[in-house]
Amino acid sequence: MKQLQFLIKPAAGHCNMRCHYCFYRDEQQNRTDAEDCMMSLATAETLIRRCFAELDKGGFVSFAFQGGEPTLAGLDFFHFFTQTVRKYNQKRVTVQYAIQTNGLAITEEWAEFFSKEHFLVGISLDG
């Protein structure tokens, strides 16, 4: 049974903190538009479609999100992502989600989403 693992940076190095030691800090100074670093829904769907084309029943896929700060891609992005996974997961492979976040953007709505979709949530304490 095939297993796939993806590390996804939906907001690239974009972050809502400015930690002096972060290597993404220098990168962000070169960006003029935060939207330039966000993963498009079309790219997300292509990744998901290709992923499930490779897997058979009994397979496993892990989608781990990190950044920068992945929550800056927005809750709508994550809703789209999980809905698209359900759309393409016709063979009913096991899906696991994880996210590494600084937690600053997490609201009750985010927490409910993470719970509903069974995300493993890691909080980084930086700053």
Predicted segments with their positions:
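Short, histidine-centered active-site or binding-site loop motifs used for metal coordination
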Residues: 25-28, 65-67, 127
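Canonical Radical SAM [4Fe-4S] cluster-binding loop centered on the CxxxCxxC motif
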Residues: 2-42
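Secondary-structure boundary/capping micro-motif
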Residues: 36, 44-51
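Radical SAM/AdoMet-radical enzyme domain recognition
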Residues: 48-64, 73-127
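Alpha-helix capping and helix-loop boundary segments enriched in small/acidic/polar residues
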Residues: 34-38, 69, 98
